[in-house]
UniProtKB/Swiss-Prot annotation:
Tissue: Expressed neural retina, cornea, sclera and optic nerve.
Disulfide bonds: 130-146, 225-292, 256-271, 282-313
The name this protein goes by in its record: Serine protease 56
Disease: Microphthalmia, isolated, 6: A developmental ocular disorder characterized by small malformed eyes. Clinical features are extreme hyperopia due to short axial length with essentially normal anterior segment, steep corneal curvatures, shallow anterior chamber, thick lenses, and thickened scleral wall. Palpebral fissures appear narrow because of relatively deep-set eyes, visual acuity is mildly to moderately reduced, and anisometropic or strabismic amblyopia is common. The fundus of the eye shows crowded optical disks, tortuous vessels, and an abnormal foveal avascular zone.
Glycan attachment residues as annotated in the record: 97
Functional summary from the UniProt entry: Serine protease required during eye development.
GO-annotated biological processes: blood coagulation; camera-type eye development; proteolysis
Gene Ontology cellular component annotations, sorted alphabetically: endoplasmic reticulum; extracellular space
Catalytic class of the enzyme: hydrolase
Enzyme Commission number: 3.4.21.-
Amino acid sequence: MLLAVLLLLPLPSSWFAHGHPLYTRLPPSALQVLSAQGTQALQAAQRSAQWAINRVAMEIQHRSHECRGSGRPRPQALLQDPPEPGPCGERRPSTANVTRAHGRIVGGSAAPPGAWPWLVRLQLGGQPLCGGVLVAASWVLTAAHCFVGAPNELLWTVTLAEGSRGEQAEEVPVNRILPHPKFDPRTFHNDLALVQLWTPVSPGGSARPVCLPQEPQEPPAGTACAIAGWGALFEDGPEAEAVREARVPLLSTDTCRRALGPGLRPSTMLCAGYLAGGVDSCQGDSGGPLTCSEPGPRPREVLFGVTSWGDGCGEPGKPGVYTRVAVFKDWLQEQMSASSSREPSCRELLAWDPPQELQADAARLCAFYARLCPGSQGACARLAHQQCLQRRRRCELRSLAHTLLGLLRNAQELLGPRPGLRRLAPALALPAPALRESPLHPARELRLHSGSRAAGTRFPKRRPEPRGEANGCPGLEPLRQKLAALQGAHAWILQVPSEHLAMNFHEVLADLGSKTLTGLFRAWVRAGLGGRHVAFSGLVGLEPATLARSLPRLLVQALQAFRVAALAEGEPEGPWMDVGQGPGLERKGHHPLNPQVPPARQP
């Protein structure tokens, strides 16, 4: 082990100096890798900060819209029977390919704007992951596997269909996620989930729902049905920039069994496509629609399948697999029916303003917690109110925890594919908490192929803060204060010009006499960002595997140090600021490893 350290790092010529433990610096090549990863972490931090601000700005926009419409904001759960946005299943005609098997979505053809008014896009922290289908004014149907590892509704938004004239699509927060209770992520059995929108779709807007089947069976085999989505153009390829569409024939159960083997569960799955290959859904299309036309004076589209999984994309003999919607009709109707027996969502509780909320509204919101209360009505109401407050506090912590985990995950994800890091640490592993929470699984899951990947990251453009008086709109002013607080807290990263958004590690000085049981050494770190310099203590590995393991924490410490330095920028600290991390913080100006040996600076 000592030999590996000597080979990796140039050590001083003597082991001891004046009785003090020996120090060693990471070589310039390692500092370059650290700097590159630090810059990527800064970019991820800036995007995460912008997303947090966008989320609150979006809440303000929707709160203002609700106040203008009804004079008072109401959580979505208190809205009863919102009007449906027009007749279901009606769409503009298009030229989707019906007979030839050369198209893909994976290929297909570009759909004209507004051709699929029920097609929506689900985004996690601004990153598009799955498709979905609007089935009612407040409900979207999608695949349950989209939410494996990411069940927090506060992190999701839904982008509605754009208009036929190319109007900008509306982005709506998610209020509730209801995966089917019997969904099995190993077999994709019952791969279905309902998503409740925070605000219902406007009746006059471009989005309208698809029709749900009235009978528990699908059209006969051979029926040409439509698929649409933004998914990959080929397996492991880039996602489509615009909606693409194609038509695929329904296949018989026997044909599907022969093609797909025991992985197919006919009770809840159907398959569609050409056995010759070529036309199929792909990664990113998960949760999207498989619709078939219902003949009549006014033809309409009926949703018979939700994109679930496949063996590759458009490969010969491997049709796509869809969750059968018809067999879940009763469950869908039950979940979409307004009911006070459902526990309030985190978004409803976070929008609730206990000091200002009307008593009747609070009672309706918290009624779930009074269901099994054996006491008097007054005592049960007080108990329900207290439980509402307790869950609200848990939701606040949950939101904060997911935001912090997301920041750490973004920094970690940027470490793996870098050539310099592969040279130093070929086996970088995510910490267990981040791994368990990671939502970046393949969308339109390729169960039989391990090389699939999710679509690229995209973040929503910053929305302007809606203007208007808060009078008569309770809860709007606290949201504006929260927005101002977020803007202030993240100003340190948002105000850094893009040309200066680069982290430079100047020195990492490790104490060879401080090795821990995990193989890490205590180190003194100096780094710079846009003319601002910080110094802090941390733990670093000197071998490839331990160095890789210590990088995520080191980068998070650097981000925290730059934030603290920015907040204290007006204090007379000089060009360097000591921001010790973790236990045993040292006084400013003192070397954390040896008070008598100041850290040498590189030229």
